[in-house]
Amino acid sequence: MPSLKGTQTEKNILTAFAGESQARNRYTYAATKAREEGYVQIADIFSETADQEREHAKRFFRFLEGGEAEVRACFPAGVIGTTAENLKQAAEGELYEWGSMYPDFAKTAREEGFEAVAKVFEAIAVAEKQHEKRYRGLLANVEAGTVFKKSKKVVWRCRNCGYIHEGEEAPAVCPACAHPRAHFEVLAENW
């Protein structure tokens, strides 16, 4: 691959690296807030997504050749809200990445002759699209009050001990391990 030094693609990679790095930290903070509010599953999803953002940042960082590069970019700053607010902000950020930023960066990379970089921007955009979808689904559950209560019987699983319960809502306390409702999720059999 030709040198990235001094190209717009180098600046775009550095911008993406900074954005992914900051998203990782914001999601880590949002995970703490979700746990405080009693949403253990959502906290774990924020943490999992933070780890995925770290991997995206690492992938971008490996393209960089060292030295200094100046970029101008805007990032969300300074506010960790409620879990609902954090989910909404996260979904909007993910939409921006996959919907415009990364496609634009891929186009520039192609124009400058960096096909491998363009493909990475496009591949990471696929993950960001799924992140947005998941955050919007979780937000809908929080807003509707259906994180721990559904309109029909479902199977609930205690994330702490594995206890299974069938009903319209998760138990207030797990009868097996005595952990609070916050540790229950709808059972997902995705193997």
Placement of each model-derived feature along the sequence:
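Non-heme di-metal
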Residues: M1-W191
